[in-house]
Structures are given as C-alpha cells and as structure tokens.
Amino acid sequence: MTAHRVPDGLAPTPLEKYLRRAWPMTPGHVFRDALKKRDVRVNGARSGAADTVRGGDALTLYIDARWLEPEADILFSDDRLIVAIKPQGLPVDADQSGVGADTLLTRLHRRWPGARLCHRLDAATGGIVLAAADDGVWEQAFQAFRDHKGVVKGYQALALRDFDRPEGTLDAYLLKDARRGEVRVVHRDAPGAKPIRTRYRVQSQAAPGLWRVALEPVTGRTHQLRAHMADFGHPLLGDDRYGDRAANRAYPGVKLCLWHACLTVSEDSPLADYRGMRFEAKAPEWV
C-alpha cells in the first residue's frame, strides 16, 4: 500500500492520466488493472478510470511497491557525493505543478533524505547524474556546473546522415523560448541569445546513414546537444522535437538516443575531494 497526496493547486485531472504523470516509469497495464479492480482510493473512496483528482486529494494505492517505489541505480557514493544512473523517461524532479511521485530525487531521498541534485538531465535523456548529501560537496558541485569548470561531460548518441568530417567543434548561439519549453539555434549574437559550443567525434556506423557519436557540451545549455546537432544537419535518432520525425519512424519504439555516459572531475575542479575521478555508465543498445 502506498499513500500519496496530490500537490496543492492542481486542476481537476483524470485519475489514470494523473497516475501516469506521477509515476511515468510504471507500465500502463499496472494502473489499468488497479483501476479496473478499484485498488486505488481517492479520499478513502474506491475509484476507477472515470474519476478525477485535484490538488490536496489523498490517494491510497494498493499496488505492489516494486512498481511505485523502485530503488535508485547508484554508480558511486561515499554518502557525501552520489553518482546515480537515471533511466530514460524518468524525470530528475517534480514538474512545474509539483507532480512527481517517482523521480530520480524521490528515489535518492529514500536513502539520503537531504540529497540535492547538482545538475539536471532532460527526462528523455538517461545516464549519469550527480547529487550530494553533504552541503559542502553540493556547493562545490554547484559551482563547478554553474561555471562550466571542473567537470567534463561526455555523451553517447546516435546521429542521422553521413558526416563530412569525423570530428569537430560547433559554435553558435541559443535562444530559449520558456513558454514553449524549446530552444532555437542562431548563428549570430542576438538579444537573449547565449553562446554554445559542442564537440563531436564520429565513432562507428550503426546502420546505413546512422552513426554512433561522442558529444561533449563545452557549454551546458538547455537542449543544447539535441538542438545543436539538428542545426548541424545531424539530428539525433528518436528526437521528435528537434530532429527528423520521418527518419525516426523507420525505428519504431526507439527512444531519444542520447546518454550521459561519462563524467570526469578535472584536477582544478571545485570538487576538491574528487579530483581526477572518472565515472562511466554504458549507453543502451538502441538499435
């Protein structure tokens, strides 16, 4: 049995839709079966798929805890710095409305109640995420990520279309549309634009017109790698926001092929106790 409170202020929402939003990694059939059996109670009343919830409602879910309270996948921890592996599709934290019963942070809080995220990944992107259970370590890590100094991030991706050069550095500017939650690459400075730099290296061919690439975001802007590679003419497979939707349909079921695979703490990093350490997480076999 799992007790849950709907965040205050949430507008009336269909119960099944809310459950999927709050627990995005739980298979849909788990909720469908529970609602059919009336194993979900809203404010004490047995409820089904036709019911709604709103801010402040109390939910009681009679569902196996393995679906609702999974453990975090931990790559390294000394109970001060935590290096977790976030699965694709799992948000790092609750959304703007406070919805998020299953996030990377809630998983970490079961073992480290005071843990804080040092940086973020998009929900669709998987791989390494740093968190801290120690205030001093968190401040050091926050400084490193804020100043883009002291940590080197390496991503693995699958990119479409043949490359003219096996490696290179891309420079441009990024404009953010906060209302739409999207960004746009431009090639000259403009009001509100921030400079971006991305390094790429082609590694091997995964299929005709599809290449495994290593990416390094020298700057760390929202959606930088996805938007920059699409602007470069090599969108990432599975990216329906910035990429090639027609090409993506040739690989049904494939998620965004972007994975934070390695993180190196440099010798001059503010993370003084972890200088020289390197963390690696193998990318999935997408195709």
Segments predicted by a language model, with ranges:
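Long C-terminal interaction/binding lobes of large macromolecular proteins
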Residues: 200
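C-terminal amphipathic alpha-helical segment
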Residues: 181-192
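Short beta-strand motif preference
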Residues: 130, 213-215
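Catalytic strand-loop-helix junctions within cyclic-nucleotide turnover domains
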Residues: 163, 206-208
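A generic structural motif
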Residues: 160, 203, 216, 266-268
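RNA pseudouridine synthases
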Residues: 1-180
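Pseudouridine synthases involved in rRNA/tRNA modification
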Residues: 1-33, 190-191, 208-210, 218, ...
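Short proline/glycine- and basic residue-enriched helix-capping loop/turn segments at helix->loop/beta transitions
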Residues: 193-197
